[in-house]
Curated annotation (Swiss-Prot):
One of its GO terms (molecular function) is ATP binding. Keywords: ATP-binding, Cytoplasm, Disulfide bond, Nucleotide-binding, RNA-binding, Transferase, tRNA processing, tRNA-binding. It is an enzyme of class 2 (transferase). NCBIfam families: PRK00143.1, trmU. The gene is mnmA. The record marks H118, Q329 as: Interaction with tRNA. Its main location: cytoplasm. This is tRNA-specific 2-thiouridylase MnmA. It is found in: Cytoplasm.
Amino acid sequence: MVKMSKKVAVGLSGGVDSSVAAYLLKEKGYDLIGITMKVSCDLDVSEDAKKVADKLGIPYYVIDLTEEFKNKVIDNFAEEYLQGRTPNPCAVCNKHIKFGALIQKAKELGADYIATGHYARIEEHNGRFLVLNAKDDKKDQTYMFYSLTQDVLKHILMPCGEYTKDQIREIAKKIGLEVHNKKESMDICFIPDNDHGKYIKGLECRDRIKPGNFVDKDGKILGTHKGLIYYTIGQRKGLGLSLGKPGFVIDINPERNEVVIGDEEEIFNEGLIAKEVNFIPFDSLENPMEVEAKIRYSTTKSKATIIPYDDGKIKVMFKDKQRAITKGQRVVFYIQDMLVGGGTIESIVK
């Protein structure tokens, strides 16, 4: 349990969740400071966040992490697409920025802990910090926290995890926060129009975007694609092909600059290999384990077995074939409401 005398830096985004998180902690008597991370010259949420800090009567700081965000998140985002993978920038940001660089900056301001408005619960059991599903299943964000280590988890508070979204909005309205009915942001924060292709074309790496061939699984040329960054596994729309039947992206080959097209049944696979794996309740996987797994943020959990593999990687075998397992995305594991861990999808087991 956190001692009330400890200083807590609350990450204020200007939205309702982080604002109410700050209010809930202030009501419990914590010594708070509000901080907003600046990650883009074009993205400024500090005005709403400053209003919330003033309303709650807490000190407020803007932390400039623009350079760190570019180096860790944006560059990785572009490189993954250029390599034919589909990145998850939010997972990268959580690991390196929100719960990496931001924690370090908060410590420099004298804070012992950082709090956010995320929907997840962190509890200590027998000296180990566990991540549990939020009370609001529809808003649960635990998928994004699989990579957090024990050293990081012990410094994080997530009060919104004990409430539903409707309850959070009601609290905000009750205490007079202007953001109580603010619309949620669903897109990638640094790509507000959700057009990642246009965004990457505006970066220095634009010259690496090259047209290439659409091919079938036998290598027969079907047409010309605009560049690997525009395609992802399972994609059907926007291919510009006339095949006489529906065609789906079943593979992307960066070495040959080819996008492989096939039938829908070919995007269903039974397993995957994951790298960069992290576990939360324990340090490493020694034996096969039955879990429920998610291969992207928006999917439901599916029964699977995780198996130790070479070089710290793991094999994940699903009870039922999964649609569009995608390299670069994250696979995350659960046992009931406990987050077990996860990793980056490296390859597909067919």
